[in-house]
Amino acid sequence: MKKLTVAISAVAASVLMAMSAQAAEIYNKDSNKLDLYGKVNAKHYFSSNDADDGDTTYARLGFKGETQINDQLTGFGQWEYEFKGNRAESQGSSKDKTRLAFAGLKFGDYGSIDYGRNYGVAYDIGAWTDVLPEFGGDTWTQTDVFMTQRATGVATYRNNDFFGLVDGLNFAAQYQGKNDRSDFDNYTEGNGDGFGFSATYEYEGFGIGATYAKSDRTDTQVNAGKVLPEVFASGKNAEVWAAGLKYDANNIYLATTYSETQNMTVFADHFVANKAQNFEAVAQYQFDFGLRPSVAYLQSKGKDLGVWGDQDLVKYVDVGATYYFNKNMSTFVDYKINLLDKNDFTKALGVSTDDIVAVGLVYQF
């Protein structure tokens, strides 16, 4: 707690930061366009939990390209990579990672189709509340956990404005091929064949949306549940459905999502809940002078966890703010107030119950 108090006092003496920046156009000729974008996020966590305390600096670099094939057909691609800045040179680049890598074709008002490493369709709704200065988006949208966040081997069809007939009405369909990861360290990131859908409608700042996805689970995932059903889901299929509401106008941003998952949600890094009920809500206001305060509440409750019964997996209030110096430079502070109680469940499975304060300075282009 002493570290948290020091962190908050230090941050209170400084102002906070970050605004959406445009990518740098590096080529635009003969119907071919290439944009380069990137960011450096120099940040530090303060927490009584050693695993969540320390430097978490990283840099990201990516490009977006497109080529006009004819009046109705456009090709496009995107790649994004993350470089860790908190490792010694002797540790190499083992923690660096490819975030996005996909290519596709857009057929005018008939939509687009792409394939590669991209965002899962369930994140079309999850993204609405994943807007906090540092934390958030962690009750059910998890990277490489089926189609809830960034995912490997997804083929995606997207249609905006419903074939050009209804402004603001968008829908998507997605298929994910099997990725069999059998090592215990990454078995939660494996998946069988799966499909998903999403639909959103936005009008004058108001938005409503829903998503559904279902996938086969790998043999490793199913067998783990047969051995230890208290902490490993044993179902053969993973499912998620989610719905969301948002308002984004007049400098105000409000959003909330509710979702339920089956045999999908990961907790304490390695374990999978049989069922989880998840709720997220966020409110933000953008002042004209650059300050954007943020407050949020997030909760994920695991259901039917064997001898553990029903348990909170994630539960916290988040209070933070970002200050934008300009479109390229910003600073932030984010305070995650952990509401999980220390009990037999959290102690046995290593679920953190400590608060975290994050402080950062961001340059992006």
From Swiss-Prot:
Which Gene3D superfamilies would you find in this protein's record? Porin
User: What is the top-level taxon of the source organism?
Assistant: Bacteria
Name any one GO molecular function: porin activity
Q: Which GO terms describe its biological process?
A: monoatomic ion transmembrane transport
Q: Anything else of interest in the record? A: Encoded by the cryptic lambdoid prophage DLP12.
User: What is said about its interaction partners and assembly?
Assistant: Homotrimer.
Name recorded for this polypeptide: Putative outer membrane porin protein NmpC
Q: Name the gene behind this protein.
A: nmpC
